[in-house]
Amino acid sequence: MSRRHSAEKREVLPDPKFGNIVITKFMNSVMYAGKKSVAEGIVYGALGIIETKTKQNPLGVFEQALENVMPTIEVRSRRVGGATYQVPVEVRSTRRQALGIRWLISAARERNEKTMTERLSAELLDASNNRGNAVKKREDVHRMAEANRAFSHYRW
């Protein structure tokens, strides 16, 4: 970490279709090699598939999926007298969102559907119904924190 200046937070503009900042952050995470238009096509395509499958507002399904994936607590390593403890700590809201987005996308990339659009829509639908690999990842992190609850007094 830098000792001088902390990095300034960049302002993220809302996406053109839904006017939502979280969708823009999601799109930027899907993006490879600066290809924003490809990422836009993937995300909007996935939301379109969700709308046709569920007949619901795709933004609501997306927000529910993200809410079901975001962790509230995680473990961080802390060295105390030669031993390393996994200490459970609460997750800040910005990190919660970033982790949720990251886990959703990585879970979608590991799926077996043909296109990324189909994978992403399937993972979002699963996550909104509390299923899928992204939700499993969140539960694993929570389980680790629960198992190491005895070390919570080492917090910093």
Swiss-Prot record:
InterPro entries (UniProt xref): Ribosomal_uS7, Ribosomal_uS7_bac/org-type, Ribosomal_uS7_CS, Ribosomal_uS7_dom, Ribosomal_uS7_dom_sf
GO terms (BP aspect): ribosomal small subunit assembly; translation
GO cellular component, one term: cytosolic small ribosomal subunit
TM spans (from-to): none
Keywords, sorted A to Z: Ribonucleoprotein, Ribosomal protein, RNA-binding, rRNA-binding, tRNA-binding
Pfam families associated with the record: Ribosomal_S7
Gene3D superfamilies: Ribosomal protein S7 domain (1.10.455.10)
GO MF entry, a single one: structural constituent of ribosome
The family this protein is said to belong to: Belongs to the universal ribosomal protein uS7 family.
NCBIfam families tied to this protein: rpsG_bact
Quaternary structure, from the entry: Part of the 30S ribosomal subunit. Contacts proteins S9 and S11.
Function noted in UniProt: One of the primary rRNA binding proteins, it binds directly to 16S rRNA where it nucleates assembly of the head domain of the 30S subunit. Is located at the subunit interface close to the decoding center, probably blocks exit of the E-site tRNA.
Protein name (Swiss-Prot/TrEMBL): Small ribosomal subunit protein uS7
The species this protein was found in: Bradyrhizobium diazoefficiens (strain JCM 10833 / BCRC 13528 / IAM 13628 / NBRC 14792 / USDA 110)
